[in-house]
Amino acid sequence: MIARYTPWWIVQQIDLNSASRRPIRLVLINPRCPESFWSFRWALRELLPDKRAINPPLGLATLAALTPVDWKISIYDENIEPLPTHPDADIIGIGGMAVQFHRQRELLHYYREKGYHVVIGGSYASLSPSAYEGLADTVIVGEAELIWPAFCRDYEFGVPGRQYHQPDPVDLRHTPTPRFDLLKLSSYTTASLQFSRGCPYLCEFCDIPVLFGRKPRTKTLAQVHNELEALRPTGVHNVFFVDDNLIGYRPRAKALLEFLAEYQRTHNYPFSFGTEVSVNLATDPELLTRLRAAGFRWVFLGIETPDTASLTEAGKKQNLRSNLLDAVRVFYQNGIDVFSGFIVGFDHDTAETFERQYRFIEASGIQVAMLGLLTAVPRTPLYERLERNHRLRQDVQPGDNTGGQTNVVPLRMTYDEMTAGYAALCERLTTHRAIAARIRNKLRYYRESPVPRQMDGHEPRSVLWRLITRGISKGGLGCVAAFLWSLCRVRPSLWYLACQDWAAGFSIREYTRRYIQDPSLKERMLAEHYLSKLAHKLKNPIMNGFCRIDLEQFTKPVRLRMVIEQSCGSVDLKAALRTLDHLLHGFRTLTLVLVLKELPTGCNVYVRQWLDRLGHYSDRVTVEWEEALMHGIDSSRVAVTTRTSG
């Protein structure tokens, strides 16, 4: 069904019956994201314990602003808080990306069975609406500014459609200010804004032109002003413009930057900004100067590869117009840090590609270098080409391209050669020496911006102390030496940047070790030791068939699968807890999968307390329990799947 819709600003004015009508209750949910390169779990856990995630769900806050004003709306982000088991709601709206699909599916099933009207939307629903067939009552396909109010109107009249499709780009000049008041912004390191959608370039692997078109559309400066004014009283200092290319339409980008610079001066520089831009910004000194004056502290560049043949193949023409290494250094010289994405697996890539990528990344000094495998996303030109050539793996779903797997069959390497080379490259980039070398190569060119820097409220000395005691010192003498080397001959005014890079390096190193590298022999031996102790603690339940323990050593990450049947009581669970804690602490690439089957009622409270004790391991603990949500398992602390498997 293609919904017929009325513009939202007209829908909002329609008087539907009397004031005595009970407000419709809407709960919007952002499902838990599996750990990824961008999670920075180590930094959040060890350095910023009052923060739970990086970015809030801006899309849901925008959706809430598009909802009729008389509706009762709540937003839950499973990445920072548990989900309600029986919310006071009529409608459950679930958003998210491809990496969240597994959890989306579980939540849709759970809430639909409870009798709620469930709605799915977001980027993956827009790219692959057929994936949600039979899972949701309503599917929102495309940008929501027009079709979400249409759904709301239809629901109020009792005739909600099954699918609402927005085939054409919408005019962002009518997008309302997001409902930041519904977000728990204090739990995030960064707030999010959006100025534009769309990108003029057509990179073969990118889904942005498919989702948002090639003609960038922008909000007005008045809209941006209203959003900044809504954020400023919250005390947020770090703001991420989520635009896929902020300079996609340069005349309006220049006007935005001029406005932001004036706003910052007027209000004593309350914000530090970051965004995504194309690398050819380095060739526009005027625009770069405006970016710095507006208070942008970092940019994300899609460098992808230093190989010109691969860039040409991918349609990345904007990266061929200048020397990429020089371009990165231009940003440093303007006091702007660089994050970047890199890809291996292009058709022109060979076994030598990994060494070229390593040399470039090290020389560039880019610490937050997201190295991924080429992945074909549905509806992109790459996906369609590889599908025609029968080069898509059906056993791998497109999603997170940094997890060591891809649905692309490479051309000049075997699949195993590519994944092994990728894992080895990730390992090389996350050694302590490699982290330090990139810091030195960055700070050699970095010039501090003259724009005042707004701190985010964390006491720098306490964060530095945590970095040294929980990261540097625990890394051994080699790590201490690398840390001191990274600060050698560096101006003290830039030490904060070096420490930020170490925090990022430790986070990426932890993710790489857990999901990409094979565990060390020492870790395997430690696992076997504690596994035997665990089996001894649970020998009676195991002998009676009430408990099973299996160590799956050839998965990434390595999994300890523990199945607990009905008659395994709380005494046995308590005996196993300390051993499990030691095992997870010592074997840092291990994931515990706890399968609970029909536990006696008396054990439920104890299980919740037990999982709370293990909650600081976050994604490393997964609970498979059909009634996990019903029994109040905090799914923001441990990963939860509601489908039990044996």
Task: Report residues per predicted region.
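Structural recognition of alpha->loop->beta junctions
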Residues: 131-150, 290-298, 356-371, 609-629, ...
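Short acidic/polar active-site loop segments enriched in Thr and Asp
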Residues: 90, 237-239, 297, 367, ...
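Acidic, low-complexity intrinsically disordered segments
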Residues: 4-238
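Glycine-rich beta-strand-to-loop/alpha-helix junction loops that act as flexible
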Residues: 119-124, 241-246, 595
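A short helix->loop->beta-strand "cap" motif at the edges of active sites that frequently abuts
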Residues: 111-117, 269-271, 296, 336, ...
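Radical SAM enzyme core and accessory elements
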Residues: 1-28, 35-37, 49, 72-75, ...
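Radical SAM [4Fe-4S] cluster-binding motif and immediate context
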Residues: 176-339, 344-359, 387
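Flexible glycine/acidic-rich beta-alpha junction loops that bind and position SAM and/or redox cofactors
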Residues: 33-42, 128-131, 201, 250-251, ...
